Amino acid sequence: MNITFENSIKLLRNLEFSGVEVCLVSKYWDDSDVMKFYDAGYRKFGESRINELIRRTGIFPKDIEWHFIGNIRSRDIGKICKHAKIIQSFDRPDLLSKLEQYPDIEILIQINISGHENRNGILVEDIENVIEKIEMHEIKCNGFMVHPPMDSSIEQKKQWFKETNLIFSKYHNYTTLSMGTSHDFELANEFGATLNRLGRRLLDNK
């Protein structure tokens, strides 16, 4: 094992010990990187590109739990649902009629916590209404995902992570708060993240 991989495994083990799960974002990874972490015992992997999701589910072990974390186009719902276990980036109620055709799919509601018009996600003021629609369609929803703008200040991220955690705490049947990436996972964990999304950090962990 090289030092980068050893350090990454230590990081993952420490997160597990603290009660935080990790979805390994393999967007920029070679197939060999995926298998290296698979062989170390990790099973949650995230893809944002549909073609790669399809290709990798075809060549990797079937016990990998694939998460889709990219933008969702209506015409791609079938492809995503056939190859992923969880969609972390659900952000449009108009997708529900197609999602209900795939009873095994699970979703997380992506929150547009910044409220910026150019950001994906459900606005905070619309969350309750969207949850009602999800329940009407009998879609399995496990919680929320949030991804604040990367150029946000630490203080701004603290505020947004805190606000997201308060929203999460209102829904006691939800178990997953996907919050924190390679850039800000430590901060997100201070505010109650249960799932981090780490990619490049694990390949460059000196």
Q: Residue spans of the language-model regions?
A:
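Conserved catalytic cores of soluble enzyme domains
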Residues: I72, D204-K206
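Expand to "…catalyze enediolate/carbanion chemistry for C-C bond making/breaking, isomerization
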Residues: N189-E190, R197-D204
